[in-house]
Each structure stands twice: as C-alpha cells, then as structure tokens.
Amino acid sequence: MIKINFPILDEPLVLSNATILTIEDVSVYSSLVKHFYQYDVDEHLKLFDDKQKSLKATELMLVTDILGYDVNSAPILKLIHGDLENQFNEKPEVKSMVEKLAATITELIAFECLENELDLEYDEITILELIKVLGVKIETQSDTIFEKCFEIIQVYNYLTKKNLLVFVNSGAYLTKDEVIKLCEYINLMQKSVLFLEPRRLYDLPQYVIDKDYFLIGENMV
C-alpha cells in the first residue's frame, strides 16, 4: 500500500490497488504530472508506504505515452535479467549444466584464440552475460491501447522492485469496460496502480479534486 501527498491535500491519499485520481484544475493537474516526472529531485510530491518509508525513484513506473512506452527498455531488462539469474541460483542442477556448456564454449573459443596470429585474450562468460547475449526480452504482441496497458501492468506485476505504476491520462483512450477489466486485474494482483486523470473517468469509483481544491470520493462502494 502506497500513500501520496502533495501541497493541496489535507492528508495523504491511500493508493490501494487500482486508484483513480481526477484533478479538474488544469494547472494543478499539469503541476502534479511534472512532480511525478521529477520525483527523484522533487520536494513537493511525497510517496511513501504504511511504514512511512519514502518510495525511491527506481520503485516508480510512470507511463505518459502508452503506445510509446518501451517494456524492453534497458532498466526493465536489467531487472528481468537479474531475476533470471536468481532463478538459476535457486536451481543448482540447471545452473551447473549451463556453466558446463559455457565452459565448453569458452574452451573452443580459447583454442581458436591461441591459433590466431594476434595475441588475443578472453574472459569466462557468466550466466548473466549469456542471458544478455541471447537477447532475452519481453515478447510484445499488443495491437490495441487496452492490450498495451495490460502488457505494461503484467510487466509491473512481475518486477518486484517496482511499487507504484502511474498512468497519466490513459482514460482518454479506454472504454469504461476496458478500465473496469484493468482495475479488476490490478485488484487481483494487489499492487498499487494510479490512474491520474484530468477529467472524471466515467462513473467509476474515483477520487476527485474539484476546482475549489476539495478532495471528494465519488461512486465509492
């Protein structure tokens, strides 16, 4: 569970699973989006857990361009490759087999290095390096914005070091039924996802900061 606080709030807002936050005032909305962009150096936006521990910038996933968001970006792949390496560490027999095969490959290459006229040197290849060389990445098959959102959420759920996903103005591209389906999936995985919207998102449960800067809950069960 993540809490958010910024100057116009009287008290922190709890982001429990899927949370929709609508901000009617354009200047306040754009300012908050900017604070999220600059979270690593920003002092106005506070994100923290129920133990009052501040969220690190590396724990935040911010999506402002759904179709342009690269789930295979270098930072994400680094986390995935690291997780795969840990999986091998938990399976000693499989890890041993891979290391033996890697050693065989190294020996063959070493022999060719010795045969070469140049004075060549080499290093032993690690499992992590093998994963990178094999080009391990996420298979992307999304054809619609809804499918891309679902794909991003799945990646976020897999990445244990990410603790808050924020979609900016995604409601403009999604039907009510699609938003409901995304929220249902998010609530099942029990991780914090914030939909930050400049206008009310249908008649769904949401928090609204109106033009008088009052925070109200609408359509809450």
Swiss-Prot record:
Family: Belongs to the CRISPR-associated Csn2 protein family.
Residues that coordinate or bind Ca(2+) 3: 139, 143, 151
Protein name: CRISPR-associated protein Csn2
Amino acids binding Ca(2+) 1: 116, 118
Keywords, ordered alphabetically: Antiviral defense, Calcium, DNA-binding, Metal-binding
Subunit annotation: Homodimer, in solution forms homotetramers.
Residues annotated to bind Ca(2+) 2: 124
Disulphide bridges, residue numbers: none
Gene Ontology biological-process entries: defense response to virus
Signal peptide boundaries: none
Cofactor(s) needed by this chain: Ca(2+)
Function recorded in the entry: CRISPR (clustered regularly interspaced short palindromic repeat), is an adaptive immune system that provides protection against mobile genetic elements (viruses, transposable elements and conjugative plasmids). CRISPR clusters contain sequences complementary to antecedent mobile elements and target invading nucleic acids. CRISPR clusters are transcribed and processed into CRISPR RNA (crRNA). Binds dsDNA, binding is disrupted by EGTA.
GO molecular function: DNA binding; metal ion binding
Effect of residue 132 to A: Abolishes dsDNA binding
One Pfam family per UniProt: Cas_Csn2
Protein encoded by which gene: csn2
Top-rank lineage group of the source organism: Bacteria
